[in-house]
Amino acid sequence: MNTSSANSAIIHSGYDPKPDTKKALLNVKGNKIWHEIAPELGIPFKKTGSFVVAIGTDEFKKLFELFDRGIANGVPGLKILNRDELFKKEPLINPDATGALFAPTAAVIDPFTATLAAAENAKANGVEFLFETSFLDFIYENKKIIGIITNKGNFYSNWVINSAGLYSDEIAHKANTLLDVSIIPRKGEYIIFDSSKFFINNVLFPIPSENSKGCLISTTTHGNVMIGPNARLAKNKEDTETTKEGMEEIIKNAKKLIPSIDEKNSIATFAGVRSTPSTSEKDFIIEIPKNVYGLINLCGIESPGFASAPAIALYVIELLKDVGEKLEEKREFNPIRKPFVHFHLLSYKEREELIKKNPAYGRIVCRCEEVTEGEIIDAIHSPIPATTYDGIKRRTWLGTGRCQGAFDYPRVIKILARELNLPEEKITKKGIGSEIIFRKTKDY
């Protein structure tokens, strides 16, 4: 879930991609689908709309170019706001702002919960997941791919979908396809602010460049404000470290939109890595290779990849139909997923009733975000179990407040060890190699 969970968390409306590209087509379709499926899957989703803010006369003229591009892409409801209309929406905006392009269909989402929710729903409908399973090579028969070789054995299928993100180019080359592309890892760094110190209502963008939508300022589904990203060439595909220079760059650019931002109120930083294709078009690559049957490549799915994701799935279905695959809709498919209980969102009456049923919900483990032991146990025993500290954190939002886990860490380790029947030294932050406790200093 690397890039899928470390991004701007925006369901873009679709005004930015060049018309007549896969990005343009799938962004607009994907946006519409997200509005439909987010409630079904219990995904935190806020219909905020977004504003592209112009500073000065020259930038205001560029809003009309973006407006025309959005109309060509089929984005509904676009409107250019004058200065007064913009300040009524966001009074903290730079006084030099001259107007904005308003896109009402843009939204913010919790990207990790969205990814997890889709996976849990898939599992409920019969999909099997294999974790810590590494792809090694393809299995061929008569020049057709019929399966894959992994560290846990061989698996066979009529089709293999290469959706390996940052490594999708390497998978495609492993199959000896004619795809002439490399994934260039471009890092984007972000800063998260304390929700009690800094508040905006919407998503704010600067005028975009050819290569980036720029440094945004956005509300989140959890009430915090997030700023970023920048765009720097990553050291490698796993380079998610944040840098002093990157933080300074983000703050400087964000202050062009809201000058009153105070970096002292930041509580966390993170970075994600974009899967930027080396092709000149910079468009999504979604294809069945002409020289290799049985494989579908999804390469270069950078922004607006998350917003486009459900539409990409439908696009792949059409590719399969085009080559003669007879697909049947699963009649008993259940699109509904029950979301996790979030204690802090409940009314006092609902809290009392829940604690009566299960006293574990009455024991607060994370004070900042009011996450209870009951929620942690739910996450550990969920359809796709949380077996690490970060797994718990992502599902419950534990450890994301002002103290960044300083209070809850030892308590979560104890709960994980107890529920998984493991020694505390075996509990990890995010999987093998990230053990938190190395040894006991004494026995109790």
Question: Which ranges hold each PLM region?
Answer:
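Glycine-rich FAD pyrophosphate-binding loop
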Residues: 1-6
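Dinucleotide-binding Rossmann-like beta1-alpha1 core, especially the glycine-rich loop
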Residues: 9-89, 98, 214-215
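Short beta-strand to alpha-helix junction loop
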Residues: 18, 25-28, 53-62, 101-120, ...
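Helical element adjacent to the flavin cofactor pocket in flavoenzyme catalytic cores
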Residues: 101-159, 167
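C-terminal catalytic lobe of FAD-dependent flavoproteins
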Residues: 117, 212, 221-222, 233, ...
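Flavin-dependent oxidoreductases
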Residues: 138-144, 149-243, 252, 261, ...
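Iron-sulfur (Fe-S) cluster-binding segments and ferredoxin-like electron-carrier domains
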Residues: 238, 372-382, 406-424
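Low-complexity, small/polar and acidic-rich linker and loop segments
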Residues: 421-444
